[in-house]
Swiss-Prot record:
Protein's name according to its UniProt entry: Small ribosomal subunit protein bS6
Gene Ontology CC: one annotated term: cytosolic small ribosomal subunit
UniProt xrefs under PANTHER family: MITOCHONDRIAL 28S RIBOSOMAL PROTEIN S6 (PTHR21011), SMALL RIBOSOMAL SUBUNIT PROTEIN BS6M (PTHR21011:SF1)
Function of the molecule: Binds together with bS18 to 16S ribosomal RNA.
One Pfam family it belongs to: Ribosomal_S6
Source organism of this protein record: Rhizobium rhizogenes (strain K84 / ATCC BAA-868) (Agrobacterium radiobacter)
Length: 150
């Protein structure tokens, strides 16, 4: 059996539970045709770069599949029929990645505290930083003439 990574985009107006139901439905199709589904990741609702079927956002989901080609073709056929699936892409891979995908790592990285989280809050008040001795005394400089505006 071949190894595949499969990503699909579901419509923005369905709930996260419905996305999970779609994943389970397609997992059932793969298993019914003699395959196995490994890692399943739900990347959540994300903005699209451009509109797809009048949608600006979509729910992203990733599945690692170990199945014969016929099982993948059947799953893709059902995705083409489904109104809830906007796009899908299946890629044959040599081996599945261990651990979370790059998208999940990025999401985890966003949750951690920032590097400067330890610093105290800066207070500039009215932004007065005091005299600037490198500029010299500006009191004796003549004022710039202003043009009369009409």
């Amino acid at each position: 059996m071949a190894l595949y990574e499969h990503v699909f985009l579901a419509r923005q107006d369905i709930s996260a539970q419905q996305v999970d139901a779609l994943v389970e439905q397609y997992k059932g199709v793969i298993e019914a045709n003699g395959g196995k589904v490994g890692r399943i990741e739900n990347w959540g609702l994300k903005s699209l770069t451009y509109r797809i079927k009048k949608n600006r956002k979509a729910h992203y989901a990733l599945m690692d599949i170990d199945a014969p080609a016929a099982a993948v073709h059947e799953m893709e056929r059902q995705m083409r029929i489904s109104e809830d699936v906007l796009r899908y892409m299946t890629i044959a891979v040599e081996k599945h990645e261990e651990g979370p995908s790059a998208m999940m790592q990025k999401r985890d990285r966003d949750d951690r505290p920032r590097r400067d989280g330890d610093r105290p809050e800066r207070s500039f008040g009215d932004r007065d930083r005091g005299p600037r001795p490198d500029r010299g005394d500006r009191e004796d400089r003549p004022r710039r003439p202003r043009e009369d505006r009409v």
